[in-house]
Amino acid sequence: MTIDRHALGFGYGEKAVYASDPWTSRGRLYDEGSSPTRSDFQRDRDRIVHTTAFRRLKHKTQVFIAQDGDHYRTRLTHTIEVAQVARALARALKLDEDLAEGVALVHDFGHTPFGHTGEDALHEMLQPYGGFDHNAQSLRIVTKLERRYAEFDGLNLTWETLEGLVKHNGPLLTPDGKDTRGPVPQPILDYCEIHDLEIATYASLEAQVAAIADDIAYNTHDIDDGLRSGYLTFDMLEEIPFLSELMAEVRARYPHLEASRFTHEIMRRQITRMVEDVISVAQQALSEVKPGSVADIRAAGRVIAAFSPEMAETDKRIKQMLFKRIYRHPDIMRIRTGAAQIVTDLFRAYMDNPKEMQSHYWVDHIAGLAVAAKARHVGDYLAGMTDTYAISAHRRLFDQTPDLR
């Protein structure tokens, strides 16, 4: 792995020709005047941070249920960590840091309470009505469900931020219109009818670094939380050569380090090596593609910000370890079963009696809706809940609520 340090950005100087430019943005769905003090991408980031959806991430599960302890990561702390890695990558590659950060900050808005378990349960309930997808839900939140402004629903974010939100994991369609990862969620197709996000092309490089930053952050920090919880041990980490090498490096330099500091020294090295790997791969890809603009990035037909084959294999092995040792651990599976029951019970209760939602907006706007629209309305309400609110709502409606501890 080699990095051209002379080509790195350090937060000053001109951006690369292939970086997104807020001054030539494709604009917003609803035209607004420009700000004399902030770029359009800075305004997007600021709007995202001030949303209700962002604050709710504090009490939404990353891996461990939010009530498990104050030291475990939540969706909010994970999101902040992703944004930090995304900014670091964007700075090194001379991209627009504000756009990369904005995409990172908004990427998890659509997650339900109880993480992927809640999403799976809600998807099952909504299956007859088009299902549920957290990425599509993120788009619904920032284009419709956040109600803050007098002249429009949503946040009226720039085209570039919305593109990054929808396409940060790659195109949703092939150039000839075929699905790349299963059917495109209907909310995304509906929005593209009025504001075409060009879902058959790759996203900007800013969006790509936000996506790879997500991988770096959650792999590293799930290991940290796994060690803290006891579901992982240092011996388990030794089974992965990359992690074993990092541990040997730390032991050689600090022979008698206490466990908590030892863990941190491993994690910081893991993040650094992964970030440097992505920078090296991106620099090589850019030298091959030779993009003269962000349009060339979108038309490149390949991911620019990615892991090397060796690091991709390490990433795969880490995911397999986390899946086996944590995500499928009997304790976690028991909690997941209870969490799924809470989401399922609440959905059925609200469909049977919408007044139980106990919110004037949600109750008033459900009257007269057809069954499919009613189900989506209930799904929107449920998806916005935090873990703690969903548990308390279930306790209010049912005699027995699953113990998620």
Swiss-Prot record:
Molecular function as annotated in GO: triphosphoric monoester hydrolase activity
HD domain mapped to chain residues: 75-219
Any Pfam family hit: HD
SUPFAM superfamilies named in the record: HD-domain/PDEase-like
Record flagged with keyword Acyltransferase: no
Keywords of the record: Hydrolase
InterPro entries: dGTPase, Diverse_Catalytic_Enzymes, dNTPase_2, HD/PDEase_dom, HD_domain, PHydrolase_assoc_dom
Origin superkingdom: Bacteria
HAMAP family assigned to the protein according to its UniProt record, in alphabetical order: dGTPase_type2
NCBIfam families assigned to the protein according to its UniProt record, in alphabetical order: dGTP_triPase, PRK01286.1-1, PRK01286.1-3
Family: Belongs to the dGTPase family. Type 2 subfamily.
Protein name: Deoxyguanosinetriphosphate triphosphohydrolase-like protein
Annotated organism of origin: Rhizobium rhizogenes (strain K84 / ATCC BAA-868)
